[in-house]
Amino acid sequence: MPRVIYFDCFSGVSGDMALGALIDAGVSLDDLRAMLQRLGVGGWELHASREVRGPLAGTRAHVVAPEDHHHRTLTDIRALIAGAPLPSAVVERSIRIFTLLAEAEARVHGTTVDQVHFHEVGALDAIVDIVGVVAGLDLLGVEQVFASPIPPGAGWVRSAHGPIPVPAPATLALLASVGAPVTADETPFELTTPTGAAILAALATFRRPPMRLRAVGYGFGARRMERPNALRVWLGDMDDETDVDQDRQDRTSAEHAGSGESSPVLLETNIDDQPAEQIAYVTERLREAGALDVWCTPIMMKKGRAGVLIAALVPADLEDRMVTILLRETTTLGVRRRAVERYVCARDIITVTTPLGPARVKRKWWRGELIGAAPEYEDCARIARERGVPLTTVYQTVMGRLEDASSVTEH
């Protein structure tokens, strides 16, 4: 059963509230600090303290960082995160969050993503907040993120551009980009920050899933209010037995995905006048923005010119974002689209214990039958480096232990 987390945003969401809630739910503060130190940026401190606010006990997380005068671009932040020795899921999720932030800022200020200079969002404490939340999810083994409707708050707040209405324009742009549900809450404070909105817009599905609950965490915000200023997270394992109808729906969609409103969209465009490194950048952007798959095919175009067909299979609710990336990042004048249906195998992840060390294995299921399994590359590569053995040897060792039930741990 996949590990899932539900963000219960009854008083909004911010980066520090999310950090506190994850620590309260079981993330080791030492492990989290160690993960963040891999960014290679010094000067920050991460503190967490237990507090009682009214009827609730929880954790207040606080990032202390020197005043940061760097106005980083998305390219700067991408390079910082991608160059750090972090798990691939942490890198991909973190970059996806910052990409959404850049796109929201560009829409609000009427500029392009490349011209956006992050101020508050690009400050060191915000980088630690965002990468810290993603690292915390990874340390908890979370595979899927869910969230409740979001109360944005009301009133006014100070920003680098002067006073702005609440919700902040960037917050609204982020929530609108994914069609996030919001509540009619008139609390005269900023309940949801751009950082919090970006985290959920990039990672969450907005519904409460059936789960077998394992832990609950409360993360407090800095402001003290009459009601608890807290974010609650529910950590658990997706449980088919808790909802038979949901189970049937999930199994059907896993095998025959793409019917009705959930049909993915296939986007295609032909390019014959851009260098290969720019095409590679476009495909990377599409994947970071949430494409299900991206591929390129060599083609012959008019006048015998060699070209490339860029194709992206994308969720329907992300179609506009993907089309915008293709139009902005390539020389194309148009993008073809069509709704498609697809068959998708159900999958799960187990951990296999071997003499070389533990490694995760992704298993493939079709109509209740196990039809394939593949070791996770990141785990095998780490073991190969640590043990000084060939990568192929690690793969063979992991696959050889699959049949031994005592070596397998279900997630």
UniProtKB/Swiss-Prot annotation:
GO MF term set: lyase activity; nickel cation binding
Similarity comment text for this entry: Belongs to the LarC family.
Record keywords: Nickel
InterPro entries to which the protein is assigned, alphabetical: Ni_insertion
Protein name: Putative nickel insertion protein
Pfam families per the UniProt record, alphabetical: Ni_insertion
Lineage: Bacteria, Bacillati, Chloroflexota, Chloroflexia, Chloroflexales
Annotated Basic and acidic residues bias: 245-254
Ranges in coiled-coil conformation: none
Residues covered by region (Disordered): 241-266
HAMAP family, sorted: LarC
Domain of life, per lineage: Bacteria
UniProt-listed Gene3D superfamilies: mk0293 like domain, Transcriptional regulatory protein pf0864 domain like
